[in-house]
Amino acid sequence: MYSDSEDESSELSTVLSMFEEKEFTRQYTVLKTLSQHGTTEVRLCSHHLTGVTVAVKALKYQRWWEPKVSEVEIMKMLSHPNIVSLLQVIETEQNIYLIMEVAQGTQLHNRVQEARCLKEDEARSIFVQLLSAIGYCHGEGVVHRDLKPDNVIVDEHGNVKIVDFGLGARFMPGQKLERLCGAFQFIPPEIFLGLPYDGPKVDIWALGVLLYYMVTGIFPFVGSTLSEISKEVLQGRYEIPYNLSKDLRSMIGLLLATNARQRPTAQDLLSHPWLQEGEKTITFHSNGDTSFPDPDIMAAMKNIGFHVQDIRESLKHRKFDETMATYNLLRAEACQDDGNYVQTKLMNPGMPPFPSVTDSGAFSLPPRRRASEPSFKVLVSSTEEHQLRQTGGTNAPFPPKKTPTMGRSQKQKRAMTAPCICLLRNTYIDTEDSSFCTSSQAEKTSSDPEKSETSTSCPLTPRGWRKWKKRIVACIQTLCCCTLPQKKCPRSVHPQK
């Protein structure tokens, strides 16, 4: 009893001390625990220089335990959009820290349980990404060997990330592996038989179990004990619901072939009819090359003390040191900013957009006019002039004007506060005699064949001209502060003499 509690306290102190080493705390701050399995723990941390959150997996460094070292080497090899990215490796005498990107989203297990089962289109989209990542791994000589719903993260947009290569292994073409590993429901027949196995064919079997689970909500081989599951797997007994499409049933049958030699490779599956129905294309390519670093990120890192040559060397040789981590974190932030750039610029609350000509809210009540202000001038912005010219809303020619921009790029348009477009006091616009026509009015007049010819150019009728003439005279009188003599009206009643 005493020894058990002593072991638990020793294990807890070991985990706590793993994240207190100076080499680690100098660069990162621990925020919270994400998961813990024995002496292996994953915590959410913050990078000091950039403030970006990362996932840190701490491993107890033991030279005799090769799988831990193998996981580090495997993560260094891989670079794929559907595989969680390794950013940095910190090695001390006692621990190994794997600094990785945070996989946003939820586990595939939770996603399936919430929906009970996924529709074929959604399952196909997820499966295509899984196949792309696994096909890439096999091309790099890496097998995962622990594919399961808990190790697949799906975000709100349906993007997939495969995590946890702790049971992964490297292999050569034709090489057989012997280590027994994996979740019971995902173990293929050859491993249950204790035979040396082909690593990629084990991943293909696991993909079949995952696909079956996504579209049905249950596992194909179930049992309360390992022996019961083993019996079902070796006999290859499972039911495929008839409500699934014929091509999907065919795909599941190929993936769950009990004979490993009959299972297709990831490359073979590319031409399967069920995958041809989807919109996503399958590629086994890696992430973008960093041989040509971004000059803006290089300049930013130089300002905080990094040397340009050190940055180039770190990226070229993939050292996974502090320099490479800082560059990749800054690049990830820049990509997110670029994705939201247009939206944030267009939705700047401090810079309201130009009001539309047909928007009644743009025409507010006119201010009180002073005697020195003319009343026959209507102000419109350059953007409104351009819109009116396109819609045929005005016939008056406007000189070309340059649109103000922000920064050096002509694509980065700067929003301007639009002037209030209003009609001044004692003036109004009549659609019958005005030269200021909106697009909706032009459409209305063009639909009438009898009036289309005259309404398109909006000519001034004699009656309208007399109105404008009186207004212009009144404005000139006000500006010049002069009055014209008025005729006295004859009185109808005269005084008697």
Swiss-Prot record:
The question of whether Iron-sulfur is a record keyword is answered with no
Per the record's keyword annotation, is Kinase included, yes or no?
yes
Q: Name one Pfam family in it.
A: Pkinase
The annotated region (Disordered) lies at: 383-410, 439-460
The record places the active site at 146 (proton acceptor)
Enzyme Commission code: 2.7.11.1
Q: Where in the numbering of this chain does the Protein kinase domain appear?
A: 28-275
Residue ranges of every copy of the UBA domain listed in the record = 292-332
Substrates-to-products reaction catalysed:
L-seryl-[protein] + ATP = O-phospho-L-seryl-[protein] + ADP + H(+); L-threonyl-[protein] + ATP = O-phospho-L-threonyl-[protein] + ADP + H(+)
Q: Which residues bind ATP?
A: 34-42, 57
Q: Which family does it belong to?
A: Belongs to the protein kinase superfamily. CAMK Ser/Thr protein kinase family. Smok subfamily.
Biological function = May play a role in sperm motility, especially in the regulation of flagellar function.
Q: What is this protein called?
A: Sperm motility kinase Z
Task: Tell me which species this is from.
Answer: Mus musculus
Q: What is the lineage of its organism?
A: Eukaryota, Metazoa, Chordata, Craniata, Vertebrata
